[in-house]
């Protein structure tokens, strides 16, 4: 059987660039090489695309704090539409190896916000993960919360700040509505980039300024007292949920360094030590949230479980990490689906959805 060529797109012009490199390394290592050939498509921090050498594409590959994309002499351009060669050498216009399906693992801005997905749709390339709308909606925490709330799902109370209204809403008003502590977040960032915990007006001002360094819109959330539970969802029209896992923190909250740099910052417990009926309740809510946002392929749904066993949805991540400590693959391993089989299934789901999309009528 002829192997499929899988283009793994990674890196990106994002605050989560290094996280993406870690995820790509693990996917390359785990992919079923008897079924798939890998084409590495690395994006540097300036947004330039490169074809990378699979044997030597990372610097400091085993050091999360210093991992980097190795410079490549071959930069590429993409040719939209149905062509024999979708990728060409940007320097000389010569065709580059074709790909059958794209596995995007570009976390954060321009990677999981619908931008990359839109480009791949225009190129008529199958790709792993959610489509444009779901990707954009889940990336924007303000939009996510509004859609979940309208669907009757439980979310933390919040206020949205923009550059236009931020000075019209005082700290006293925010505290009166949401109480303390607060969490201040850029609306369109992941991996806790630019997130602060706030317990005073002085901290609030600093936190809002920091969040606006990363986005034009900022979310201020009520702090929820509860356990941090995560659930993995997999599928297109009939998604399935994994068993649940828990993030047990040794720090104040799940910050970027806690997730990816400090090995002692948090403990990942899979499966979570919760009652079976609570596990099933969270799994059902995760699937409902996934379908509400129109997700496909995969997503990780993060919730808080309060002492009263109330489930409060925190966020939905449509391109969850595949790093050594990432919860998404661990949850499926605990549910009986190994790392290699998970990657294979994600590729299959991408091809299935692409075939269904191409079967739709485009003319009257």
Swiss-Prot record:
The protein's annotated pathway: Cell wall biogenesis; peptidoglycan biosynthesis
Binding site for Mg(2+) 2: 315, 317
Ranges annotated as spanning the membrane: none
PROSITE patterns linked: ATP_GRASP, DALA_DALA_LIGASE_1, DALA_DALA_LIGASE_2
Reaction equations catalysed: 2 D-alanine + ATP = D-alanyl-D-alanine + ADP + phosphate + H(+)
Gene3D superfamilies: 3.40.50.20, ATP-grasp fold, A domain (3.30.1490.20), ATP-grasp fold, B domain (3.30.470.20)
Alphabetized SUPFAM superfamilies for the sequence: Glutathione synthetase ATP-binding domain-like (SSF56059), PreATP-grasp domain (SSF52440)
Cofactor: Mg(2+); Mn(2+)
Top-level enzyme category: ligase
Residues in ATP-grasp domain copies: 145-348
Record's keyword annotation contains Cytoplasm: yes
GO biological process: cell wall organization; peptidoglycan biosynthetic process; regulation of cell shape
UniProt keyword Ribosomal protein present: no
GO cellular component, one term: cytosol
Co-factor: note: Binds 2 magnesium or manganese ions per subunit.
Subcellular location: Cytoplasm
Record-listed ATP binding positions: 175-230
Family: Belongs to the D-alanine--D-alanine ligase family.
Protein name: D-alanine--D-alanine ligase A
Lineage, opening ranks: Bacteria, Pseudomonadati, Pseudomonadota, Gammaproteobacteria, Enterobacterales
